[in-house]
Amino acid sequence: MSAGGDFGNPLRKFKLVFLGEQSVGKTSLITRFMYDSFDNTYQATIGIDFLSKTMYLEDRTVRLQLWDTAGQERFRSLIPSYIRDSTVAVVVYDITNLNSFQQTSKWIDDVRTERGSDVIIMLVGNKTDLADKRQITIEEGEQRAKELSVMFIETSAKTGYNVKQLFRRVASALPGMENVQEKSKEGMIDIKLDKPQEPPASEGGCSC
């Protein structure tokens, strides 16, 4: 396996598991990050899907292993084994679906049952493009994250809003990144994804 430019150093791998209720946008967030695309036709994830992405950070290269889990009840028994050796849990809810938000506490409890405090947890409120149907305010999301001592961000997989920032913030919190965070207090790490450079012109939607 290639070290992707980190000659003499094995490429560090970090496992990110995406959790949340059905149709909150877990697969769409991964697809936006991996391919910068969005598919309007919804297809439920069956069981567990796995994708891998190399990220070139300021001072090193890491490989993110993205595990996309099914939200349906019938697949719940599979999920703990995937949480068990994860570095990061990304718990996603739909800002237009109150139940999906309420269930985030249960998902985070599941993560802590399997991993204790030895895990980074990011709470993500997805579908900000549907602001007119919003049921959970950003303040409520921030408050929930504060109560549960986890990170928080809102995103739109459809427009791409904050998706890169989500992964930047996760990357800045990875084990061994403390020295980079010191140099980069705002977590604004220069991340080059392993795909051709995008033209500097329009990027479609907000590129925050």
Swiss-Prot record:
One of its GO terms (molecular function) is myosin V binding. It is a lipid-anchor. GTP binds at residues 23-28, 39-40, 42, 45, 71, 126-127, 129, 156-158. Regulated by guanine nucleotide exchange factors (GEFs) which promote the exchange of bound GDP for free GTP, GTPase activating proteins (GAPs) which increase the GTP hydrolysis activity, and GDP dissociation inhibitors which inhibit the dissociation of the nucleotide from the GTPase. Its EC number is 3.6.5.2. Keywords: Cytoplasmic vesicle, ER-Golgi transport, Golgi apparatus, GTP-binding, Hydrolase, Lipoprotein, Magnesium, Membrane, Metal-binding, Methylation, Nucleotide-binding, Phosphoprotein, Prenylation, Protein transport, Transport. InterPro entries: P-loop_NTPase, Rab, Small_GTP-bd, Small_GTPase. It is an enzyme of class 3 (hydrolase). A motif (Switch 2) lies at residues 71-87. It holds the Pfam family Ras. Switch 1, switch 2 and the interswitch regions are characteristic of Rab GTPases and mediate the interactions with Rab downstream effectors. The switch regions undergo conformational changes upon nucleotide binding which drives interaction with specific sets of effector proteins, with most effectors only binding to GTP-bound Rab. This is Ras-related protein Rab-6B. It comes from Homo sapiens (Human). The gene is RAB6B.
